[in-house]
Every structure is written in structure tokens, then in C-alpha cells.
Amino acid sequence: MSFSATILFSPPSGSEARCCCCACKSETSQGSTGSQGGNPPASTPITVTGHGLAVQSSEQLLHIIYQRVDKAVGLAEAALGLARANNELLKQLQEEVGELRQGKVCTADEDRESRARTPPPEEPGVLKGSPGEASNSLPAMEEECDSVGSGVQVVIEELRQLGAASTVGQGPLGFFAAPQRDARLPGCTLAAVEGAPLLNPMADDYVASEGSIQRVLVPAYAKQLSPATQLAIQRASSETGPESGTKLPATRPEGVLGSAALDSALDESGAGGAGELSRSLGFVGSPCRIRGTGQKNSRRKRDLVLSKLVHNVHNHITNDKRFNGSESIKSSWNISVVKFLLEKLKQELMVSPHNYTDKELKGACVAYFLTKRREYRNSLNPFKGLKEKEEKKLRSRRYRLFANRSSIMRHFGPEDQHLWKDVTEELMSDEEDSLNEPGVWVARSPRFRAQRLTELCYHLDANSKHGTKANRVYGPPSDRLPSVEAQLLPPELYNPNFQEDEGGGNEKGPVSPSYDQPHKTSCPDLNSFIEIKVEKDEYTL
């Protein structure tokens, strides 16, 4: 949608008027001087209404007008998308009303059966009772739906004419300053429609019209959101930047279900225009967008491009302002380093296609400080740092082994799949680096794992690409102890008597720690798989 406007502005002189909003004084003084001097009358200055607005020059006024027109364009496009989505919902309601007009009215017997099954609802407008009562309530419902349909059509037509009306209006440039008004259908809670000029004189008539015109959504679909509506909200939050930091007013308890969650999401994204959009259009929100964002308490991944840029700027050879890991992030030196990095990052990103907010830039700097802090702590205790690094490596390998085994579990029977359903990564083997042969991984199964699950893991490894690698051999059981979560697993997965079984095995004979034939003690009935593995190892060596 394109706009073109010609703005004539002549600021009054200092002797005539001190404020550009005093149009009356400027006009009278300019008219008197024009009539006396014979010069052509000067252009009437444009008056701008707003809260705390003081225009000092014509360039500033043009800039403000451009910002508000651009903001109105984005809101109008998003409003048109919302109106179209609401119109689709209204069509579905009109189809149901059409079926009722054709004579599909509940009979008295059906009403008695429905009353016996379910309690009578409290919402008015539902067809219950005798046929006479149903026939009396049917015309009222038809009139209600007709008024809703006409109201939605008026909204759509006004939104389509919104762009062209921006060059027609001669009034002041006011944006979303009207008080909020509510209009709700009986038996359903709908959002309010806030009156706003929107550069359109027809909007004032729309706000002053009857409440039936303001009804946009219908009760049957008030708790749903169409994909088009979600797309319109996302476009509004992306196109309208953080120009205003106003917060939305708190919704009342009898308000729309999920509207508070949607408004808070728009506020957190920094889109002030989107917040005004939800207030001005009376949009009925739903928490489905929040539920679809991912798992609860999931770890947010950092932007790799931004993290790499922070790393390069901080570790540049010419940079002498670097983080001090021995101090807190709130120390004066580290705060100065963060400010320095923010300035350098903004300079680097001026010609970059990536657009990052100040909050994202600061978060990347703090994340890199935590990395330096961790390096400093590990340097104080090298053994602890190496131990944590080794544990992290083994845990990562267990996760990878668990994912590899789970990917081929669909080829096994239903009994094995049922057993694998409650398996966690803690029950996987520790794939340690061999001390004798570089590049060889020694798989050491946990001692607390049940024998049945151990046999299933051997079968999975024999049928997987990862398990049949030549550089992967089996070793003695691991010394890792079970966690509290592992001790709650069923006996098919967790062996609670693993320490007693280990003691009994030591009485019979010591377990051989050799890596050449370690399988015969842990899984003696799977020698066929082990022999194939040993042949591959001897062939490669």
C-alpha cells in the first residue's frame, strides 16, 4: 500500500507565536501582516495533537508525520488481515444460522432428552424448551447474526479504504487516543473496540455507531485462532518496531480468555504498535502461540553469528579491554568492557544484514563473560576442570548413543519397543577413550543396568552402523553410580541389587579387565557378536 502526501508548512516567527500549536494566533497575525504589506498570505501551519509533543522545526514535524503515517500503514495492513480472518469465522456462523432457517429446530422430545443428559446452560440465545419458545428465540438470533454480519462488512470496507483516506483527512493527526469501549454478545465475552481516527474520518462514525457493529467474533469460535490471524499478529510485531514503550492495561477477570497472555507476548517482543493494535481492534487472543513456541524451560540457543562476532572483537590483537574472570560482571572494569564491546558491535553491524537489538547484543557479551569466568575457575583447579570436561564428553557420547539406538528400535518387535519406552541416556554405556590404543573407544556398560536391557543393547549395536565400528570395543563395566532418577526405574531396566551381584561374582573369580575378551563376563550368551567384533579388530590392526 503506497501513500503520497504534500505538506505545506511555514513556521511562525518568534514575535508572533512561540508555540506551533497556537494556530489561531498565527493565522490572525499572519492575516493582518499580509493585508497590510500586500504580500500573499502564508500557508497555515499544521497543528499536531499529542501528549507532550513540542515541534521545534519543520524537519522535526515532517519526521513525526512520516513516522505516524508509516505506523498507521502497518497497523492497517494487520487490521485488514484480522478482519478477513474474523470474516471467515462469521461465514461459518451464518451457515449454521441458515440451517436453522431451513427448519432444523429441536423438537420437544429432543429437548427433554438433552435436558436429561446435560444440565441447562446459562447462556441466553440457545434453543431450548417448547417449540413455541424455540420459534420465539429464532428470529432474535437471526437478527443478532444479521447485525453481526453487517458490522463485519462495515469493518472490512473501512479498513480497505483506510489507506486512501490518509490523504483526505484534514483534521489533526491523533493516534489511538480515544477511550476504550466494550461491546459483547450475550453469553459470550468479546474484546473491546477502541476508537481511533487512523487518518480516516469514517472511523469516528464507526466508533460512534451502535454496539452491534463493533462485534467482530462469534461465541462459538471465540477461543480459536486461525493461521491467518496468527500471521497477521506476527507481521504486526515484526513491521512495527519498538517506537513506543507503553504497556497494555490490565485485563479484567471477565475479559477474553487468553488475551492477557497474548498482550504480554506482544509487550515482551518490544512491539508497541502491535500492543496498540490489539487494543484498537478488539482482537480475541489465544495462548496457542505461547504453547507452540517449544518445550517449557527449554534452553535458548545463542546466535552463532553474533557469538562469533563477539569472540572476534574481544580477542582482537588490537583490543586491550578484555574481561577479567576473577571479578564479577558488575565490577567497574567488566562493565566498561561490556560498553566497549557494544560500541564495537554496533559499528560492525552497521553494514551487516543482521538486525540485533541492544538486549541481544548485551546478552551475547554477558554469555562470553561467563565463558571467560568458567575458564578462570578451571585454571584455579586444573584437575576439577579436566574432570568436568571428561564428564561432559562422556555425557554427550551417551546422548548420541541413545539417539542412535532409538533410531533403529522401530525395526524390532513390540516387546522390545515397550521395554525401550522408559529407557534414558543414563542407562547407556560410557564410551571412554582407550589408554592403550589412540582413537579407540571402549564401551563400558553401567553396572546397575538390568541384564535384559544389556542384551537388547548388544542386539541394537550389532544391527547399527555405530555399534559395528572397528574402533569401538567393549570393556569392563563402568564405575559410574546411578542417580536418584535411575533408581526409580522399573526392575526390567534398573538392577537394584547390582552391588550384591558384583560381590558374588568376585567370590567366584575376579573379573578380567582385559579389553581383548571382555564380553564373556558381562554377556556370555552373545559370543557370536563378540567373535565378529574381534575378527574386525584383528583385521584392522
Curated annotation (Swiss-Prot):
Crosslink position(s): Glycyl lysine isopeptide (Lys-Gly) (interchain with G-Cter in SUMO2): 128, 223
Location (main, coarse): secreted
Residue ranges with Basic and acidic residues bias: 103-116
Compartment(s): Secreted
Residues where Phosphothreonine is found: 118
Keywords: Isopeptide bond, Phosphoprotein, Secreted, Signal, Ubl conjugation
Phosphoserine: residues bearing it: 226, 286, 429
One Gene Ontology cellular component: extracellular region
Signal peptide boundaries: 1-17
Pfam families: DUF4616
GO biological process: one example: positive regulation of gene expression
Chain positions covered by the region annotation Disordered: 28-47, 103-138, 232-254, 494-526
The keyword Cytoplasm is annotated on this UniProt entry: no
InterPro entries: DUF4616 (IPR028101)
Extent of Polar residues compositional bias: 232-243
Record's protein name: Uncharacterized protein C14orf93 homolog
Organism: Mus musculus
